[in-house]
């Protein structure tokens, strides 16, 4: 069980260090928002594929919604789900803080970007539903590539850039 907990924490930390770090790098390298989003998308797609592949034999939810669905499907217990969610949120916050730090920002740098509105909420519902659909309908052998591809696409077809992850939403509030 410890390896599953370690996988959830470390995998979520690396995922959100990648998401935020690649966004910061993209902004540092270009004032073109499209190029920044493209860089952010590519880094996230590669990281997701890598993380799901290496941690998949242990646990690779990295997302409280995915863990809750696995609880409903009776694939994990309530206790395991609760610990996963705590570790996922903690990992996301740590990953964001590390990204801030390695780019010489204050580790805790609260977001100033307004991220509110019904359109963003609906965008996140759509992104999360699509993610769950991909996870539940993909074969185990293909889940890494299908999740990575879907999230890469969802960065571009959702107005929210597809957080699709409550741990990430909390973690990203620690960065602009």
Please place each PLM-identified region on the residue numbering.
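Membrane-interface helix-loop junctions and terminal tails of multi-pass membrane proteins
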Residues: 1-176
